[in-house]
Amino acid sequence: MNFHHLAYWQDKALSLAIENRLFINGEYTAAAENETFETVDPVTQAPLAKIARGKSVDIDRAMSAARGVFERGDWSLSSPAKRKAVLNKLADLMEAHAEELALLETLDTGKPIRHSLRDDIPGAARAIRWYAEAIDKVYGEVATTSSHELAMIVREPVGVIAAIVPWNFPLLLTCWKLGPALAAGNSVILKPSEKSPLSAIRLAGLAKEAGLPDGVLNVVTGFGHEAGQALSRHNDIDAIAFTGSTRTGKQLLKDAGDSNMKRVWLEAGGKSANIVFADCPDLQQAASATAAGIFYNQGQVCIAGTRLLLEESIADEFLALLKQQAQNWQPGHPLDPATTMGTLIDCAHADSVHSFIREGESKGQLLLDGRNAGLAAAIGPTIFVDVDPNASLSREEIFGPVLVVTRFTSEEQALQLANDSQYGLGAAVWTRDLSRAHRMSRRLKAGSVFVNNYNDGDMTVPFGGYKQSGNGRDKSLHALEKFTELKTIWISLEA
């Protein structure tokens, strides 16, 4: 893969055409009230584009298009083979436009171009292609009945899905939802975060080029309290697929209950525990994976290993190795292919992370201070040790490159510390002891448990959380459960 060089990407950014309109019923269009908002480059703080500010009237327009095409059956009743062909074409186009999409992602979010080009865009295309290839292999069932009856169990598309996605992995998380939703035959109204809407807008144009019927995918940009709320309270939306904060997830559940009891599938916050036992097979490897698990994407990862639990006897040795590994994660210009850490999404979020660091200085020892990183919205690797497990630093999702270290002396204590959280998205265990690995994996209250790695995985396995980290699953065939209805058809053969 050719990552080019800083000047290449800067020149490309200058000539980049940025689409800024809504996408409704197969066409780019201004918001009904002709209002816009600015999306800002987190490096320079300069405006990138004026984006259409969609509101409830625009959601209604998108709803009309989405419902109309769904009821006509242009997509919902089409064959799996047709859907497969269109979605594979979309994946092809995403790969062909990988540099453009990666640049939009990096300009919008401040993440390193290396990661956008190597991880985000290929991962997004892979998600679309995976469900394209899977959908004609999903079968119904025939239940056992008497000889004069036939009972069939079939899966049908839910209807119109509202997909609400966050700003940390805009295109990747969009495609985790679009892949199964579209493959199953649904129509989708996509609302990207107002902080990172550019790649979603561009994706809509590529979907039309791939042959997706008009109205099947609509993109309405805007704010959560306007466009987002219009979706969550809309009486004609059949389901919401959401990734974001636990606080917003709770509001979506309330809105669904107050409207039409639409399904709400949530992937929310996390405060994942990374547990290193004294019999860890390779402390150097564990330190490297731990650093990547908290500092990748500037710590703006829902499943980041933000709590490091170290067995007392190896804690000091491990922390020395971890400090060395942190040197590989230093903020730089996001368009420089050598950069491993970019900026946080914006200065407001950086201020929030700074406030946690200031508070943490009175709660534990600051082993590594990532402040003064050189860019306004950037924060480097930050590590606190010996923090009270009850402190907010240990319990709240910071969503930045801030690691909290706690020591333990027994397996039971490690388990108690790990599970003592409102969240349950991920956890990791480093040990040579296979029996311990099994015990811990089964007793940890988390949707994903990693043994001797951190956050490995691919499209074949589900992703989601326990407790206030959400419900339902993204990725794998299990994601189709969110986007399909299960119908029983009972036929009397003697009639």
Curated annotation (Swiss-Prot):
PROSITE patterns: ALDEHYDE_DEHYDR_CYS, ALDEHYDE_DEHYDR_GLU. Keywords: NAD, NADP, Oxidoreductase. It comes from the Bacteria. Pathway: Amine and polyamine degradation; putrescine degradation; 4-aminobutanoate from putrescine: step 3/4. Pfam families: Aldedh (PF00171). Its EC number is 1.2.1.5. NAD(+) binds at G244, S245, T246, R247, T248, G249. Lithium ions exhibits the highest inhibition (97%). To a lesser extent (5-20%), potassium, sodium, and ammonium ions also inhibit PuuC activity. Transition metals, such as copper and zinc ions inhibit PuuC activity by more than 90%. The presence of heavy metals (mercury, silver) or sodium hydrogensulfite in the reaction mixture completely inactivate PuuC; in contrast, disulfide reductants such as DTT and 2-mercaptoethanol significantly increase its activity by 75% and 27%, respectively. It catalyses: an aldehyde + NADP(+) + H2O = a carboxylate + NADPH + 2 H(+); an aldehyde + NAD(+) + H2O = a carboxylate + NADH + 2 H(+); 4-(gamma-L-glutamylamino)butanal + NADP(+) + H2O = 4-(gamma-L-glutamylamino)butanoate + NADPH + 2 H(+); 4-(gamma-L-glutamylamino)butanal + NAD(+) + H2O = 4-(gamma-L-glutamylamino)butanoate + NADH + 2 H(+). One of its GO terms (molecular function) is aldehyde dehydrogenase (NAD+) activity. InterPro entries: Ald_DH/histidinol_DH, Ald_DH_C, Ald_DH_CS_CYS, Ald_DH_CS_GLU, Ald_DH_N, Aldehyde_DH_dom. GO terms for biological process: putrescine catabolic process. CDD domains: ALDH_GABALDH-PuuC. The active site is at E267, C302. This is NADP/NAD-dependent aldehyde dehydrogenase PuuC. The lineage of its organism: Bacteria, Pseudomonadati, Pseudomonadota, Gammaproteobacteria, Enterobacterales. The gene is puuC.
